């Protein structure tokens, strides 16, 4: 599978520079970091949340878990994990479990954990289980220019 179409188009529209990194098939973000030989703190993962107002994508390092209560309070919403059966409809150009953390490309409210701003480069799923996008922190932040920022991640 190629890069997810909506993500690729979004990156082109934003004029960001990136590389594609290929790795063996993986089943989790931590396994992806190991197989791609990259620090897990530099691999951004997405967690799709929902409430009565709609969907929110939380973006955080693969070495962390989301503090849902903290993010809900920050956004003044009653967020919960989105049910997995809704994801194929929302992300039709991606494989399940390999959703790129670029919710903005899908018209989704997106919030980035502040800890990602400390990394010199960011990697993220391209839409399948065998490719990553790699870009400098500045490029990633330019790509995510309309995303919110908060502290909601806790190391595992």
Which ranges hold each PLM region?
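Extended, low-hydrophobicity, polar/charged segments
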Residues: 1-156
